[in-house]
Regions:
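N-terminal intrinsically disordered, cationic/polar leader segments
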Residues: 2-104, 109-139
Length: 139
């Protein structure tokens, strides 16, 4: 997985991102490319940008998806693995700091090629071919 850097830093291996709005609140556009793992990249971005709380939404494509459904006490009771590429119909979530580390809570609805759809907590997913996220910072 490529490392994430804040929009003020540049590195060849950084996930593409751009600060769209600055002031009381900040909004970043983040573009993940093929193979980037969503949850890990968002956590790394939050850590590198020193974010304490944020909300995000996104669209694009994923592969090697693992969704968690029917959570009780914070633990998914049903895990749905999807290995084929899927379209992201909706991706929403938030980031908060717990014990000094960013915790990403993403929820997604994805569509398979046959038209069937699945939704739940996004436990894992890799961009394919890309995933675009708008992240709004509220700290």
């Amino acid at each position: 997985m490529r490392s994430l850097k804040s929009s003020l830093e540049s590195a060849e291996d950084a996930v593409k991102n751009k600060l769209l709005q600055h002031g009381t609140g900040r909004t970043y556009a983040i573009v993940m490319e093929t193979g980037d793992e969503v949850v890990g990249c968002l956590a790394a971005f939050a850590r590198d940008a020193h974010l304490s709380k944020a909300e995000f939404k996104g669209l694009g494509g994923l592969r090697e998806v693992l969704l968690g459904c029917f959570e009780i006490d914070g633990h998914p009771r049903v895990r749905v693995p999807l290995t084929e590429p899927v379209g992201v119909m909706s991706l929403v979530g938030n980031i908060a700091v717990s014990d000094g580390e960013p915790k990403v809570d993403p929820h997604a609805v994805v569509r398979q090629a046959d038209g069937s759809a699945w939704g739940g907590r996004l436990l894992e997913g890799h961009a394919c071919p890309s995933l675009e996220i708008l992240l709004s910072v509220s700290d």
